[in-house]
Amino acid sequence: EIIPVPDQAAWNASKKSIQINDAIKMRYVEWGNPSGDPVLLLHGYTDTSRAFSSLAPFLSKDKRYLALDLRGHGGTSIPKCCYYVSDFAEDVSDFIDKMGLHNTTVIGHSMGSMTAGVLASIHPDKVSRLVLISTALKTGPVLEWVYDTVLQKDFPLDDPSEFAKEWVAAPGKHDNGMAKNLKTEELAVPKHVWLSAARGFSIINWTAASKYLTAKTLILWGNQNQPMTESMQNDIRAALPKAKFIQYNGFGHSMFWEDPEMVAKDLNEFLK
């Protein structure tokens, strides 16, 4: 029995939860074929599983899709500490164990892609296929700017998009229902999570770790992407020479919001 993709209104109500370790009860949305190979979807900085909601209907129906809320985001536990990429990655590793998943594909966007890459490098046995959307081995100056700006803000935020347009308000033809709901969920992310995750990014450089990665890998990048530059793509392609690389001309950081059908076509081809 295929599990349907929840619509925008039902997205949060459809979340399931599982205690993955002492600190974290993780919330996730599941759709697709429950007996298919698992595909985990990891969202970006201050997003939630909803980031994949407009892409979901275009993905092939034969896989079991699990879109996670990472720690501190969405409905998942919000510990005081810690929010390094390795913490997100170990949570996903614990989720894979607790759910008893095998032959797992991990798709990550932005922060989620770095999480996916670190997971596949540190636990190569747990990830059979890897998709890195708008990724990098280390982050650039955009994050310092976000950090400095968040530091001066009063929380709760009333509108993050005035300063975090790069992340929050990806320009394009994205699903307005998804964008509106996602913005509300981003506003709910506590200040310590915004700041801790941003500090965590500043220490990440998984170039050396990437040599342990064995998963078949696909990298997706839009050439209008401001946070993740072309030189960052050259670096990761040098580190992962076997990876397939697809460039979307005229698309930005969240190209799967701008044209979900286009991106789903490439994902479905890779997941075959």
Swiss-Prot record:
Pfam families documented for this protein: Abhydrolase_1
Pathway: Alkaloid degradation; atropine degradation
E.C. no: 3.1.1.10
Any one GO biological process: acylglycerol catabolic process
The keyword Protein biosynthesis belongs to this UniProt entry's keyword annotation: no
Catalytic activity: atropine + H2O = tropate + tropine + H(+)
Subunit: Homodimer.
Function of the protein: Alkaloid degradation.
Record-given protein name: Tropinesterase
Lineage, uppermost ranks: Bacteria, Pseudomonadati, Pseudomonadota, Gammaproteobacteria, Pseudomonadales
